């Protein structure tokens, strides 16, 4: 009755969107997705979720209530309304409510791509920890376990040490374990929140390394019975005070070992003129380990097309800070040097090393696939296509390269999957795509081959090649019939 009821309006908008959804099922999961998205990457979602079940359920000695429901939204506002009741809420990739997970589709994150696979793995960890503890787990421990398990599943996932975390740790800004819940509540910036996630995951890593997974499971069991977190940690970790001390030592050593000897402070560099190469070089004579100075020098050399000097500077930076996976970090700039010089082999090697450490850099992954394609390294083209698919499954150029390589390699299953994806994304080319699928399936699945041939002819009745294939299938069927 109220035409200005914003809640009702938002819910009606969501209802319209849900009308375009379909449901996919597997032994343990029920996934709701927009129909086209389900056709593109729905089966990989189910496969990944079942893999996470197989890995995590035995580890945490707990089987969640079935089915676990996962909803993936291609519109960020639909995700926000379903999750929070209001649109225009940013900063969340996924949310878990115990039995239900809501997540943003990669289609809603085209401007800021991330690995959607790591997000789903992370959220299923929450399903386990929330249900195992009866929702009595503090946020820091649940988030810590999820990020820790991301890193265990794939070293490219989760959060890793960076120079901001390093500076916070060495600057004595570690939040005591007994107060970690407050780190999420009092975060004043995205950087504060990221550090809360990272520190929490490192507490979990330290607990598992020092006291073992059974001790962590014992803490979760205690939480379920109503024991407070600090009491549970005190009981199973040899005393909370001892855990605090050992963790601080552990995390400090991790920070000291990351880019040891590099100065990440920016105060001193403010004295230099960051746009003047000679001024920066002069600054580095007295501050040779300044990260800001070294990076600025490399950027200016690259800008001035002094590629040999830039290469030397960037190689030094890569050696000093091997864990930097930022998109504007030393490895990415070094790859730019090789790209400008046309040294494709060296560029590919640097990008491959970079992508062995991060699963979120779509631009680098696309470029590496191009380089592998140029070098006729077809196995790597297919491999890189799968990497790209795990970030953004809607990249048509990557799909086409993966398809061509798979066809050449006779990897028919991969090729059919790529063609099926293109059917959803390029429906105007459907007759030809159906025909290509039919050709690939001819020797392994006659029924499906015939089906796709007929679908091609349904949309293009004069498609001569499809008529020829249909006759070939019929002749093969007759030849296979037993003699009477």
Q: Where do the model's predicted regions map?
A:
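Substrate-binding/catalytic groove segments of enzymes
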Residues: 156-157, 207-218
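Specific register positions within alpha-helical solenoid repeats of the TPR/Sel1-like families, i.e.
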Residues: 17, 150, 302, 339, ...
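Beta/coil-rich, acidic/histidine-enriched accessory regions frequently appended to metallopeptidases
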Residues: 1-10, 21, 32, 36, ...
């Amino acid at each position: 009755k109220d035409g200005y009821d914003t809640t009702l309006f938002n819910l009606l908008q969501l209802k319209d969107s849900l009308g375009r959804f379909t449901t996919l099922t597997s032994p343990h999961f029920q996934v709701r997705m927009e129909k086209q998205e389900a056709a593109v990457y729905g089966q990989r979602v189910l496969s990944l979720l079942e893999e996470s079940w197989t890995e995590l359920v035995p580890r945490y000695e707990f089987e969640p209530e079935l089915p676990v429901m996962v909803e993936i939204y291609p519109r960020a506002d639909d995700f926000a309304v379903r999750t929070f009741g209001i649109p225009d809420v940013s900063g969340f990739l996924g949310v878990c409510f115990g039995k239900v997970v809501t997540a943003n589709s990669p289609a809603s994150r085209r401007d800021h791509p991330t690995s959607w696979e790591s997000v789903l793995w992370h959220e299923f960890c929450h399903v386990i920890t929330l249900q195992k503890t009866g929702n009595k787990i503090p946020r820091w421990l649940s988030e810590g376990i999820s990020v820790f398990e991301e890193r265990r599943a794939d070293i490219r996932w989760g959060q890793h040490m960076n120079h901001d975390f390093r500076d916070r740790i060495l600057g004595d800004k570690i939040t005591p374990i007994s107060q970690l819940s407050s780190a999420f509540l009092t975060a004043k910036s995205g950087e504060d929140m990221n550090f809360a996630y990272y520190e929490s995951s490192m507490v979990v890593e330290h607990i598992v390394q020092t006291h073992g997974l059974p001790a962590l499971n014992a803490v979760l069991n205690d939480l379920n019975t109503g024991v407070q977190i600090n009491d549970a940690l005190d009981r199973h970790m040899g005393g909370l005070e001892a855990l605090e001390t050992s963790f601080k030592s552990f995390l400090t050593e991790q920070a000291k070992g990351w880019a040891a000897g590099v100065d990440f402070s920016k105060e001193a560099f403010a004295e230099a003129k960051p746009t003047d190469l000679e001024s920066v070089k002069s600054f580095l004579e007295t501050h040779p380990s300044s990260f800001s100075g070294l990076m600025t020098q490399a950027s200016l050399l690259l800008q001035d097309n002094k590629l040999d000097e830039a290469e030397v500077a960037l190689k030094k930076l890569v050696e000093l800070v091997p864990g930097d996976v930022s998109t504007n970090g030393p490895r990415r700039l070094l790859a730019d040097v090789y790209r400008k010089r046309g040294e494709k082999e060296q560029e590919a090697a640097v990008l491959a090393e970079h992508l062995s450490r991060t699963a979120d850099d779509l631009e680098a992954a696309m470029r590496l696939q191009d380089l592998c394609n140029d070098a006729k390294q077809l196995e790597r083209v297919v491999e890189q296509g799968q990497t790209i698919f795990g970030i953004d499954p809607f990249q048509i150029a990557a799909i086409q390269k993966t398809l061509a390589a798979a066809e050449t390699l006779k990897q028919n299953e991969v090729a059919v999957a790529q063609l099926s994806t293109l059917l959803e994304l390029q429906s105007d080319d459907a007759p030809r795509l159906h025909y290509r699928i039919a050709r690939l399936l001819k020797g392994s699945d006659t029924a499906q081959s015939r089906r796709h041939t007929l679908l091609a002819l349904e949309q293009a009745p004069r498609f001569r090649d499809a008529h020829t294939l249909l006759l070939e299938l019929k002749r093969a069927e007759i030849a296979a019939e037993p003699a009477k």
